[in-house]
Amino acid sequence: MRFFTTTALCALIAAPAFADWREDYAVLKFGILSGENEKDRLQRNEPLRAFLEEKLGVEVEIFTAGNYDGVIQAMAADQIEIGRFGSSSYAAAYTATDGGVIPTLTNLRESGATGYYSIVVSRCDSGIETLADAEGKVHAFADPDSTSGYAVPYFNMINVENIVPEEFFGTVTFSGSHEAGVTGVVNGTFDTAATWWNNEADGVYQRMIAKGMIEEGQVCKIWESPEITSGPWTFRSNLPPELIEDVTAAIEVFPTEDVEGFRIYSEWSEDNDNNQAGFQRVNHERYQWIVDMREWIREQRRAG
């Protein structure tokens, strides 16, 4: 029979707590991108922030920036622990950190899909019904680090549609965000703009209609990309593995343990009929083609 002193027993009991990552990370910050206006994105992510705070037992803060690069650089500078990226902004973070990021989860939709689509929109009354009709017009991409708002449409325009944007359109610019691009199309600032949707019932402009930002029938889709893998929840690779797993596991159970909070987080509007069902584990291999595509785009720019 083995006997333990009181001191030894206390040490054994305390050992797991002594190694807990919370001692070094009493505050966790997660960054969110600028796809919608700041008030709405903060409101939509608040239920998840509160859930993580209660579940993990540490303070959780939301970090926002005026553009995608602000969140990417915050992660590269170790100012935030977690980022909710799109596929292209994840690839940008991967490059900016020399591979120092780890993706763990992406969105899982009720259909079983883990992807979405880049689209180009125009005003329905503009007479622009296809990309060919937009020759010489003003086109807006969303942000240089946006997957659906820039990288995918730019890549496909050149390699699939045989359109070089800088030569085909009269003007090529960046709107700064998806909502700003759609708004610019509606008010006539842009003739066309790149954004995203999940399907005909759910996407940026449909959600803007539901929020009363634009009217039904003002915006029409004129082009659609192949499916894009949804962007991942991403962690700095220099974080404790236990922290990464604990936060990932907490996000995974958010849909079932806070049903109302998840509804607010996932829908943007009560009219969304293709709700996000939850999350699915992913790894970097799912996004390597995006990294390669971004490198191709950079090479095209250098060559030009």
Predicted regions and their residues:
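Sec/Tat signal peptide C-region and signal peptidase I cleavage site
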Residues: 13-19
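Extracytoplasmic small-molecule ligand-binding "clamshell" domains
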Residues: 20-91
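An extracytoplasmic/periplasmic, membrane-proximal ligand-sensing/linker region
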Residues: 21-32, 36-47, 238-304
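Periplasmic-binding protein-like
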Residues: 29, 33, 103-119, 209-248, ...
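A local structural motif
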Residues: 53-64, 79, 160-175, 215-218, ...
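Short helices/loops that flank or line small-molecule/ion binding pockets
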Residues: 69-83, 96-97, 116, 132, ...
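Flexible hinge/capping segments at coil-to-helix
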Residues: 122-143
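Pocket-lining segment of extracytoplasmic ligand-binding domains
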Residues: 138-242
